[in-house]
Amino acid sequence: MLTRGSRRWRVPREEIAGLIGGLRERGVRHGAGRDMLGHRIAHVVLTRMEAAGEAPDDRTHDAVRRTREVRAVVDAVWPAVNPVRLVLRLLSDPELLAQAAEGLLDDDEQQEIRWDSPPRGPGSARWSAADAVLVDEARDLIERIPSLAHVVVDEAQDLSPMECRAVGRRCATGSATVLGDLAQATTPAAVADWPQMLAHLGKPDAGLRLLDTGYRVPRQILDYASRLLPLIAPGVPAARSFRQDAGSLAVVSATPGSLPAALVQACTDALDRPGSAAVIAADAQLTALAKMLGRAGVAHGTLDGDGPGARLTLVPVSLAKGLEFDHVIVAEPARIAAAHSRGLHQLYVALTRAVSRLTVLYTQPLPGPLR
């Protein structure tokens, strides 16, 4: 019931239900549908006004749409939805999650994503990167995310299917340039191949170009690292390098007792040459290696700024991607490979950080292809 002036205008419940059904059949997004419902109710009222001999115009339409009565109906039957709060509720409410996930996720999968201790609100929630793309997906279902003309994605091999969808929404009516190396895919949910990624991006027919020639890493180093490809990226051909240097690769065996001396020697040899140097190792081993170097008086720094001015940097393998150094010592490849579900991918990243010289230092047996 809407009161305007001395007249009252009534829109029956059944008619409003019909308006809602029509919008749902069109498949409009939630936010757009909410706005359209207000307009359609106003249109029904204006039709009744015209039938009663009145002459409403666009200003009347807007005024009716904004009335307290119309807004109350829209709020009741098509409430506003906040994407952050929607995902928060979904991950906190087992019954709601089960209802939404019926036929899509089994009980174990629902348990994996459900929060055991629901937060009080969005501000106290411990959001993850995976949760962020759920919020982005929800946001697009509510209000269409506008497309850009062109999107460039680097390190695309690390994108999950949901992250691909988030990128795809931003180039839905535009174009994209996607760059990556499947051998360096170190995230647990990374897509398996490029056709799968392009499908999730919404660009299944996009052109695929293989970049198989390198200039940064010497051939001897690249050939050694490429031995891992059959295990980490089956079907990906080994890249070729134009640079050759017979002395660019050294594989050094040590015993647990001789590891400190061997590490110090490898670092000293690297520091005797011009350029930057780094030790890359499994994250959990870095502290022990730092103590070995400290006891020997070898100055070193870290990525977070400790040891400013030192030419030698200790790098956890989880942060090595995208970095490059003139000289690299990869310590204990077997520990790198065993420390993560994609440890061999991380090892491949570590082995390809050197642009001049690579030393592989090990006490534990090397992963099979590197022996």
Question: What spans do the regions from the language model cover?
Answer:
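Conserved helicase NTPase catalytic core signature
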Residues: 2-150, 159-165
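Conserved helicase motor core of SF1/SF2 NTP-dependent helicases
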Residues: 135-150, 157-371
